[in-house]
Amino acid sequence: TVYGLNRIQATTDAYLGLPVDVLGTEHIVLGWPDLMGQLRSEFAVLATEDGTDVTYVPKAKTTSGTEIGVATTTTLNAGEALPVASLNGDLSGSVVTSTKPVAVFGGHECAFVPDDNTWACDHLVEQIPSTSTWGKEFLTVPLKTRSGGDTFRMIASEDATTVSVNGAAVATLDRGQVHQMSIDGKST
């Protein structure tokens, strides 16, 4: 098992690294909204093989000037990365496709979770599984020290996806749409 850690002064986040043999060719980014165009939503794509064509369609304008919904393709070789950051907005729901398996990481420079009323921000990073590995049922368990619940973001890979918590429908999402909520206690 690999545990990735990104630590800088006053902020840290970590993620479970996924092995190369489970990487895929389609990913939908999950990150966090930017804050006033200063603290950015971001993702990165890492190639595992030479000559990998990577296409992304962003859900927010990027710092490189790519407009919302405009497909951009670049070729990466093994070990090369394509970093993408929002100019403003949330890159969650951006679709990344590739001709060969890639690793995709979603996150944020320094997010205020659960909202802007939080007194300090933290860097966020998570390796995003390819859509071919996504499941339909998940269990949540609260962290013992949390007094107000844990924040969850759910994203759909298909149109008309119903999100249910403890058997009750809480949202209907189309591909790339996000539903965010706080959940108290253990849930399914």
State each model region's role:
Residues 1-93, 97-188:
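Conserved functional hotspot residues at active sites or interaction interfaces
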